[in-house]
Structures are given as C-alpha cells and as structure tokens.
C-alpha cells in the first residue's frame, strides 16, 4: 500500500507552528511526516504519526562525492541509522554534494564508494539509504546528482537492496522531464518519492504543468509500496493545502 506524507520544512516555521502543523497533518489523514528535525521527533510520535524520512547527513552541498568527507559522513550516517531503526524510520536521505569541478564519472565512483561503507549496516538495520536527485538548474546550482542516470549508476555500483534513489518528481521535471517513462523504467531502484508543482514548487494544482493523477497511477502500477512525500510550499492557506493534497492524491494510490 502506498502512503502519503508531507515535508516539515515546507510548513514550519513560516506557515505554521510545529504543534499546529503536526496536528493539521494528522487531521488531514497523513500517517507520516518527512524530514522532521530531531528536536521534534517526540512531538510527531505523540500525535501518533510516523516519520517517513530524515536526512542521513548534512549539508547537501558537501556530500558523498568527496573522499575527504567519507569518514565524517560514515559516522553521521551510522548514527542516523541507529536513530532510524529505533524510531521505525524507513528512509535516510543521502546527498551527492556539489560538483566543484568534479567530472561525473569520478563523482559517481566516489559517491558509490562512500555508500558501500554504510550499505551493510543499513541492510542489517532494515533502513534504506536513498540518494536524492535534485535540480541544479533552479534550486541547487552545481549539485551533482542532478539526473536519474547519475543516481542510477551509483546504485548499480553499490549493488545493495538498501541503497536506492529518492526520485523527486519536481526536480527531475526541471532537469529531464519524461517522468512517467522514467518511473516505469527504473522503479526498482526507487525507494522514496517527493512531489511538488512545477514551476514554483507549490501545490499540485492546475496552475502547474505536472499531471499528478497519471504520475501517481504510474507509480502504483509499478507495485511500489512505500511513501510519497509532498514537498511543496503552499501559496494559500497551509491547512487547506495539506488537506487538498491528501484528498487529491488518495484516489490514485
């Protein structure tokens, strides 16, 4: 069964207080929240919600494509695997980091080597490390894992059932489009999804170009049984946006 969640940072603190956001998400029907900061893990639990994903390490600009960061990142990721196992968090989000002149082939090789160091630990804990694909055109200039084929090659080199992609529909629409065909082709390597409207990273409404009913149906047809996390910034009433997104997507999942 596919579940829905919603990203913390899109609503807190600019739109809602932490408590109001968590209560609104629960009231709207969401079983989980994405990217919850550590200081609010207990708040989410108190409202009966799960955490669908957290960052495996920080920052996203200095990531796994740097050999000189691997010792630090291994420790951070191992620590967060322990937290994830304890709290029942299924996914830890990993980042390539920025290119800074590094060519793609070398970046892929180094990123894969970094993930190999923690893959077995993730397997033993039952936690999936998902490498996030982000656009380098609009939101994250110079980010290296900015195309599906880049992330896919990393996952192939690591060759672990617990190392997959976080396929961000908004980001990949900006970089390459062809969303449904890509999902159908590489779905076995996708461990988590993010949504948002494009352009603007706002609601999944008719003011943006992505037709989410067809995209969600395509995801369902692959047999995916994980979480789809909404990562849009609401333009209007945040609570109404939470409710509308859940209700719009539910019939297709």
Regions found by a protein language model. Give the residues of each.
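N-terminal small/glycine-rich loop or linker at the start of catalytic domains
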Residues: 1-10, 51-65, 97-99
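A short beta-strand-loop structural module common to alpha/beta enzyme folds
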Residues: 31-39
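Active-site-adjacent beta->alpha loops and helix N-cap segments on the catalytic face
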Residues: 39-49
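Hydrophobic residues in well-ordered beta-strands that form the structural core
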Residues: 51-53, 131, 167, 230
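Active-site acidic/histidine proton-transfer and metal-coordination neighborhood
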Residues: 63-164, 174
